[in-house]
Amino acid sequence: DTLLVVCTDHGYLLGEKGWWAKVVTPWYNELVHTPLFVHDPRRPDRAGTRDAALVQTIDLAPTLLDFFGAELPPDMQGRPLSETADAQHPRESALFGMFGGHVNITDGRYVYMRACHDDTNQPLYEHTLMPTRIRGRFTPEELTGLTLAEPFPFTKGVPTLRIPAHP
């Protein structure tokens, strides 16, 4: 009667493709194709099966809410893995990457990878709900170009601060 989910957040390069670690590397398959094991006691017919469906970590919270019978918020972007197991193509593509690094989109077979910054893709902005970073605040100089931006689907209708990025 226990749902068991085992996953990782990303891989780690140990010299593959000439890269070490993970901070500024392109998001190669070794980093993003990570293990996910799910045992759902409601689905004994799926025990021991392997699925090639395109899923992401955004599907984990909806999976837990679904298992416990809780309602999914209307703005939640992930989908319960119980639905994914029955769908042939639960999603057409997945977007992944990180601010300051490569941004990618995949259909599960091919990946389009784009570097974050060059002279042709300006302007670049940071979006935040509060003007702080992990280790400190934005400087007054960085905040001079701040504007309010339209909300994203995941900000629950709250506008974000749009701050010009300084790569």
Task: Please identify what each model-predicted range represents.
Residues 2, 48-107:
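Polar, surface-exposed loop/tail segments
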Residues 2-47, 56, 91-92:
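Histidine-centered active-site microenvironments of extracellular/periplasmic hydrolases
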Residues 14-15, 85, 114:
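Activation segment
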Residues 28-29, 99-167:
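C-terminal, low-complexity/hydrophilic appendages and adjacent surface loops
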Residues 32, 59, 111:
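Active-site phosphate/pyrophosphate-handling residues
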Residues 40-44, 69-71, 108-110, 116-117:
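Short loop segments at secondary-structure junctions
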